[in-house]
Regions:
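Conserved N-terminal subdomain of the carbohydrate kinase-like
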Residues: 2-109, 113-121, 269-278
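Short pre-catalytic strand/loop immediately N-terminal to key active-site residues, enriched for Gly-Thr
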Residues: 15, 204-219
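Glycine-rich beta-alpha junction loops
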Residues: 14, 41-43, 85, 113-115, ...
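Conserved phosphate/ATP/ADP-binding segment of small-molecule kinases
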Residues: 121-205
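Short, small-residue alpha-helix embedded
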Residues: 150, 215-238, 242
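Generic secondary-structure signature for well-ordered alpha-helical cores
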Residues: 33, 67, 71-74, 98, ...
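Charged C-terminal helix
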Residues: 239-285
């Protein structure tokens, strides 16, 4: 029997709303990966579509958690960061990566801080610059075009050409140890795509496309990132993992699109079985 892969995901918990840890934990676990969590904050709901939500920042808890893990000899094969609660947490998270990641372990950074040309509530360019420092530790960095523009200090626009996407991915390679997965390529009609660039082989960059669903929904980035992380860790190549993650995200949107009352995420739970079938051969190796 092969040894179980162990991953730590660091991001917030929204008690209600399908995003962040409440997506990452079941999605990655379904790949047969043991998934530990480190909440950066606890919110009563996610921040989109709700008002008056409560937030408990957990920055002060991070050092004690890391110290306890050190005492217990707890290490991880991979670490995946998502929504980070405050700018003060970056140094603690970098320390956790440095001290709790096994040799040759992999780091996935989803710089979840912006979309549609705007920062999420509470974030600014200083936060983006700190996020760039965290991206430097990542073997895989997964920004959308808005996040990429903030990382690069470039103006954002709704549409980028294929050539502009490639140029931006090459510029982003300075922020990663290995791979850039740049999401949000819309130049192909009826398709939503991404570019996968290996900084060691930039001339072999790949574009991957899935059918486009014309619905904006909270949490789709988390479904994509979690699926990509899981598929990569069980052996899929980055382009294959990105294709699978994009397909699962599309299916989750399709499950949600006809329910106008479901405005707090996508029904990702309904696509987990089909994703498990897609990866069953890899899980049994």
């Amino acid at each position: 029997m092969s040894e179980t892969i162990k991953i730590l995901t660091i991001q917030d918990i929204s008690c209600y709303g399908q995003c962040s840890i409440t997506v990452a934990l079941p999605m990655i676990s379904a790949f047969g990966i043991e998934t530990a969590v480190l909440p950066s904050a606890i919110l009563s709901t996610h921040t989109s579509g709700f008002s008056g939500y409560t937030v408990r920042d957990l920055t002060e808890d991070l050092p004690a958690i890391r110290k306890h893990w050190e005492k217990e000899g707890i290490y991880f094969d991979a670490i995946y960061t998502g929504f980070i609660g405050s700018i003060e947490q970056f140094e603690y998270i970098k320390d956790i990566i440095d001290s709790r990641l096994k040799p040759n372990g992999k780091v996935f950074v989803d710089p979840a801080m912006a979309d549609n040309g705007e920062f999420y509530n509470g974030f600014d360019q200083d936060f983006a610059d700190k996020m760039g420092e965290l991206c430097n530790l990542g073997d895989y960095v997964l920004p959308n075009t808005t996040e990429a523009c903030y990382l690069l200090h470039k103006p954002w626009k709704e549409e980028f050409t294929k050539e502009e996407m490639l140029e931006m991915a090459n510029e982003l390679s300075a922020f990663t140890k290995k791979y850039v997965i740049l999401k949000g390529d819309t130049h192909k009609e009826g398709k939503l795509g991404m570019i996968i660039l290996d900084k060691d082989e930039p001339s072999n960059a790949e574009f991957v496309y899935n059918d486009r669903i014309n619905k904006m929904s909270h949490g789709t980035g988390d479904v994509f990132a979690s699926s990509f992380v899981g598929a990569t860790l069980v052996g899929k190549a980055p382009s294959s993992a990105a294709k699978l993650a994009g397909e699962l995200t599309k299916k989750a949107l399709e499950e949600t699109i006809d329910d106008p009352t479901h405005n707090y995420g996508v029904k990702f739970e309904r696509v987990i079985p089909s994703r498990s079938e897609d990866t069953s051969e890899l899980q049994s190796r």
